Structures are given as structure tokens and as C-alpha cells.
């Protein structure tokens, strides 16, 4: 199975490490420098400094629009605050693949954002229903 994990924090990286021996996994990070550092050291020094990244794990900062068509399953391992903009950006390209989010909590008002959500306090599935309805979507929960 081709897995695309969007978000190279601790949670996304841990899942990528665990899944890569059994699946073709691409771990996507939003910052090119982060990807380059992980490729060079085969470690995610910022989030999981004690864990080596398997050689078979693909690390990418390529546009998600290029990676999504190849994915059998997309895991969104971002903070809850990034879910709405991410789904707004890639939602139209996710019609065929199942997607699961790993974010915890609810959508809070970001005082640094230009515009607050119309209805703050939404859970991830509520944000998904508003922003990208019709997805084959689910949730994967883990450590708190």
C-alpha cells in the first residue's frame, strides 16, 4: 500500500517509521530545510531525535498535488490548527483516496490569523464536513 503521511512532527514521523517496513511510505514536511536535514541524517532531530528513519522511507517536500494521486491512503498528521487550511488546499484532490486525520482537540481561534473560523470549537470531523464534504474520511487516535 502507498501511504502518504502529511506532517513530519513526532506523531507523523513515528507512524512513518512503523509503517515503512510493510508499506511504501512517503513522509511529507512543509519546510524543505526540514526534509533536507532528515534526508542527510536519516533522523528527525527536531521531533524524534533518538529514532533512525528507515532507508525505505521516502521524505518529501514536493507539492502535495503531485503526491496525492499515488497514495492509496492519506494520513493527515498535522496540528488541529492546520487541518482547515490543509483540507481547503487538498480536499478537491482527495476524492478517490481514503483520508484519516491524526490531529487532536478542536479548532480554536488563532489570535494571529487574519480571520477566525466562523464557528470556533469544531472537532476535526466537523471541520472536514464543512471544508471537504464527501471524503472517505476517518480518524486515527493515539497517545495523548
Can you name each region flagged by the protein language model?
Residues 1-51, 58-61, 68, 89:
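NAD(P)+-binding Rossmann beta1-loop-alpha1 motif at the extreme N-terminus of oxidoreductases
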Residues 53, 64, 68-69, 73-144:
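Rossmann-like NAD(P)(H) cofactor-binding subdomain of soluble oxidoreductases
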Amino acid at each position: 500500500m502507498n501511504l502518504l503521511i502529511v506532517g513530519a512532527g513526532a506523531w507523523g514521523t513515528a507512524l512513518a517509521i512503523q509503517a515503512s517496513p510493510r508499506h511504501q511510505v512517503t513522509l511529507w514536511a512543509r519546510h524543505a530545510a526540514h526534509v533536507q536535514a532528515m534526508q542527510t541524517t536519516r533522523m528527525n532531530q527536531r521531533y524524534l531525535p533518538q529514532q533512525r528513519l528507515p532507508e525505505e522511507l521516502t521524505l518529501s517536500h514536493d507539492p502535495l498535488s503531485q503526491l496525492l494521486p499515488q497514495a492509496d491512503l492519506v494520513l493527515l498528521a498535522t496540528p488541529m490548527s492546520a487541518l482547515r487550511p490543509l483540507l481547503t488546499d487538498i480536499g478537491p484532490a482527495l476524492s478517490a483516496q481514503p483520508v484519516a486525520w491524526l490531529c487532536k482537540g478542536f479548532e480554536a481561534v488563532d489570535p494571529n490569523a487574519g480571520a477566525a473560523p466562523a464557528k470556533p470549537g469544531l472537532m476535526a470531523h466537523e471541520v472536514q464536513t464543512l471544508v471537504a464534504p464527501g471524503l472517505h474520511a476517518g480518524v486515527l487516535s493515539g497517545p495523548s
